Amino acid sequence: MSIRTDKVSSLLQRELSAIFEKELPRSGPLVTVTEVRMTADLGIARVYVSVIGSEAQRAEVMEYLDAENKMIRKTLSAKIRHQFRRIPELEFYEDRLFEQANRIEQLLKSVKPARDEEQH
């Protein structure tokens, strides 16, 4: 990636995080923008979000983001329109890295006691 795409990604991540903080219901699951990847022409922003909640809540949040894509893009445009000629299209993807890390941690914890028992 170039310095320009990195800067745009960082700006979009910051602004989208602020939008989600204001727009999403407080009682729902925790939604975090973990990464934004830009295409080389800056036309598409792939937004990776981490959703901490039940499987149903995660699905609901992803459906909401897809359904409200135009509204989110319009809100983003109002915030950054002076910095860009063209606001990128937004594509939302669920980032399950946190969930996978927790699963690995649980597996490691379950293996460790078995090793300790073998040594005694």
UniProtKB/Swiss-Prot annotation:
Keyword list, A-Z: Cytoplasm, Ribosome biogenesis
GO biological process annotation, one example: maturation of SSU-rRNA
Gene3D superfamilies to which the protein is assigned, alphabetical: 3.30.300.20
Recorded GO CC terms: cytosol
Location(s) in or outside the cell: Cytoplasm
Parts forming coiled coils: none
GO MF annotation list: ribosomal small subunit binding
Record's signal peptide: none
Domain of life: Bacteria
Pfam families per the UniProt record, alphabetical: RBFA
Major location category of this protein: cytoplasm
Subunit structure: Monomer. Binds 30S ribosomal subunits, but not 50S ribosomal subunits or 70S ribosomes.
Family stated for the protein in its record: Belongs to the RbfA family.
Known role: One of several proteins that assist in the late maturation steps of the functional core of the 30S ribosomal subunit. Associates with free 30S ribosomal subunits (but not with 30S subunits that are part of 70S ribosomes or polysomes). Required for efficient processing of 16S rRNA. May interact with the 5'-terminal helix region of 16S rRNA.
Protein's recorded name: Ribosome-binding factor A
